[in-house]
Amino acid sequence: MTLSVASRIAALVLLAAAGCARDADDSFVASVQRLRPAVVLLSMRVPPEHKKDRYDDAYATGFVVASGNWGSDILTVQHAIDGAWNLHITIGNRLHAPARVVASNEDLDLALLRTPRRRLPSIALGSSTHLQGDVGREIGLLGYPVPDEFDDEGLGLATSLNTGRLSSIRKDALEVTLSIVPGESGAPVFIATTGEVVGVAESRFDEERSIGFALPVDDVKGFLHRYDRAHGF
């Protein structure tokens, strides 16, 4: 009888755990579906001294942070667009539009672009002040990885989801277990279960160990606030 009760309890625990896992997966899927429409591919031309490998063009990821009748503002990292010209955005291989740099900060490695395309889906920024208690939590990144020479047919067709964990909070960076590949710089980094954007993908530190860094979103908000204040918004 005791064994039977214990077995039932164990079965209930397993069912509850499975239900929690399904709920977490559903939340992750919902987060991706909500954020994806605002993530854009940035394509550009770069000077010869900035060229890498065989590419004449350069690519990065950005995401819309504000939009209205005046156009749309897109956030990315400054190093990705440094010295670039002929900037364009693409969303899901459907919408193509020119863009220009309206603000940048080399120290923060942030840049703000503007496109004349109006009323695009945008992403609300979260907060990075509370993240110390979230170390170990699952995170996601939505970006446009640059294809290698063996796979160049999917570029610009769809965003790619990259998943990992928030592994450490540093003074001016979030350490993540994400292998941030070329093209994903500038992508939003978000908490899987809530979809809260807490950082911007910046660089890969260790390819073998899949260690990357993201800029804390509070630094991003400060950058945007200073831009708005300087322009009377």
Language-model regions: role of each:
Residues 23-29, 45-74, 95-98, 186, ...:
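A conserved glycine-rich beta-strand in the N-terminal activation segment of trypsin-fold
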Residues 63, 179-201:
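Catalytic nucleophile loop of clan PA
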Residues 34-49, 139-141:
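A short, Trp-centered hydrophobic/proline-enriched beta-strand micro-motif
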Residues 59, 65-110, 115-118, 139, ...:
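Catalytic-histidine neighborhood of serine endopeptidases
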Residues 1-10:
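Bacterial N-terminal signal peptides that target proteins for export
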Residues 27, 121-174, 180-184, 202-212:
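Flexible, gly/ser-rich surface segments that form the specificity/activation loops bordering the active-site cleft
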Residues 23-32, 42, 87, 120-122, ...:
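C-terminal cap/linker of serine protease catalytic domains
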